[in-house]
UniProtKB/Swiss-Prot annotation:
Family, per entry: Belongs to the universal ribosomal protein uS12 family.
Alphabetized UniProt keyword annotations: Mitochondrion, Ribonucleoprotein, Ribosomal protein
Name listed for the protein in its UniProt record: Small ribosomal subunit protein uS12m
Gene that specifies this protein: RPS12
Localization per Swiss-Prot or TrEMBL: Mitochondrion
Biased composition (Basic and acidic residues): 10-23
Key word Mitochondrion present: yes
Pfam family, one: Ribosom_S12_S23
Length: 125
């Protein structure tokens, strides 16, 4: 317990908050190249393989990013745009690829939640 005099001389030091998405450098998105695209099994109660891309960002950080939605065309040397947002059942995956931007195509024929998957508006008949 500090004395009043010690507090006057030095004050209290605020705790520093850790940045969960340090690789983004305070940016909303970053662009990168995929050196590897693979699948990874999730944590315990879940079992479906998660599509994961290793991405080398434009600031030379190497990260793992989740590719959302069913099916994708991403392969080696694809350019992708990355946003924050972790995958709860995949340890170490703290980013998402944005569908419908750069080389990663959106999902065709998707009708609901289209903006999250880069899907075109369907033609009304």
């Amino acid at each position: 317990m500090p004395t009043k005099n010690q507090l006057i001389r030095h004050g209290r030091e605020e705790k520093r908050r850790t940045d969960r998405t340090r690789a983004l450098d305070q940016c909303p998105q970053k662009q990168g190249v995929c050196p590897r695209v693979s699948t990874r099994t999730p944590k315990k109660p879940n079992s479906a393989p998660r599509k994961i891309a290793k991405v080398r960002l434009s600031n030379r950080h190497d990260i793992f990013a989740h590719i959302p939605g069913e099916g994708h065309n991403s392969q080696e040397h694809s350019m992708v745009l990355i946003r924050g947002g972790r995958v709860k059942d995949s340890p170490g995956v703290k980013f998402h690829c944005i569908r419908g931007v750069k080389d990663l195509l959106g999902i065709p024929d998707r009708r609901r939640g289209r903006s999250k998957y880069g899907a075109e508006k369907p033609k009304s008949i």
